[in-house]
Amino acid sequence: MGLSGICITGDDTISGIASVTGLKVCKTKEMTANLDTNLTEKFKVAGNMLDKHGLVVLHIKGCDIAAHNKEPVKKKDFLQKIDSELGKFLKIRTDKLRLAITADHSTWSKEGTHIDDPVPVLLHGHGIKSDSVTEFDEHQVLNGKLGRFRMYQLWDKFFA
């Protein structure tokens, strides 16, 4: 595809995967793989990197950590922080941006374990048609135009 890409993460495993797939990796001490990560910094760096790279992967792990720790309220609070920072980011970045939001797996906060529920996927931005879904969760997105699909199909849907 000829895209130059970068991955912003605080997680060593994701850094390794990014490197193997040809993405550059951006990490700072403030960008952790935990609930204390500096989301403002991550989104700021993502915005700066969009000016230099065609693809920016912004990895945020805090929700998974809270779920593994069986702390659903912390998971909810962290999701709200992500939502707030994403909202600020989208107000600044009004260019021909395309955005995919998803997860690599679901984690049940009650038991702290991974589960095989489908993960929600949101595609947003230039050239992507909206649908009637107004809430982003595992149940509501099943009513959207993407429906259920295998994650290996995400790339094709993103660039369709």
Regions found by a protein language model. Name each.
Residues 1-160:
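Feature captures the catalytic ectodomains and active-site-proximal regions of enzymes
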